[in-house]
């Protein structure tokens, strides 16, 4: 017996392609423009999900790579675009990507920095790259430095702080930054507004 068959119809071909072709959703461009689009991309049922998150001033989110943490950060920055914010991360690629995404959306009120660059810049020479490599920065030095920065005329008066990849930064300033810079008053983390992501 021969099982040879002639050309497939267009409908049959589309059915075959649908069954065997991988479904890959490219998310690298983060082309979502609005909160509903972002929630749709995240497979959220409705806008209430992110809205309820934004009502809490202190949010910590765990999620592996590709779970939408950067998209949530972008939506958060977009929602609070009239306020001054600080986005900190560990790696240079993520910082560059976030700068690009925010610039493309004309979201100019959020400073994007690597934590190392940020702390070296505000330290006035008290810490260096080697201090980060050796993990030799004391909590007391960080607190003194951050409080000095917060009381200086150069402090941008951040309304919120986002820290991405916090698991890489817990021993080099993430807690001190949240405690010293995210609070409106002197009660630190208890009264600050922040969004923290970790894997």
Range-by-range predicted roles:
Residues 1-199:
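The feature marks helicase ATPase cores and/or their adjacent C-terminal helical subdomains
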């Amino acid at each position: 017996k021969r099982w040879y068959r002639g050309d497939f119809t267009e409908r049959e071909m589309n059915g075959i392609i649908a069954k065997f072709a991988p479904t890959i959703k490219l998310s690298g461009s983060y082309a979502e423009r609005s909160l509903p689009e972002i929630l749709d991309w995240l497979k959220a049922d409705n806008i209430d999900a992110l809205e309820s998150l934004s009502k809490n001033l202190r949010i910590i989110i765990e999620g592996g790579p590709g779970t939408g943490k950067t998209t949530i950060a972008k939506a958060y920055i977009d929602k609070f675009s009239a306020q001054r914010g600080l986005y900190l991360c560990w790696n240079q690629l993520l910082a560059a990507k976030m700068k690009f995404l925010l610039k493309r959306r004309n979201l100019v009120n959020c400073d994007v920095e690597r934590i190392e660059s940020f702390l070296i810049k505000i330290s006035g020479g008290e810490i260096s790259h080697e201090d980060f490599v050796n993990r030799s920065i004391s909590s007391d030095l960080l607190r003194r430095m951050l409080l000095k920065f917060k009381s200086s005329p150069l402090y941008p008066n951040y309304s919120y702080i986002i820290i991405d990849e916090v698991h890489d930064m817990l021993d080099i300033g993430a807690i001190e930054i949240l405690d010293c810079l995210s609070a409106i008053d002197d009660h630190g983390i208890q009264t600050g507004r922040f969004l923290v992501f970790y894997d």
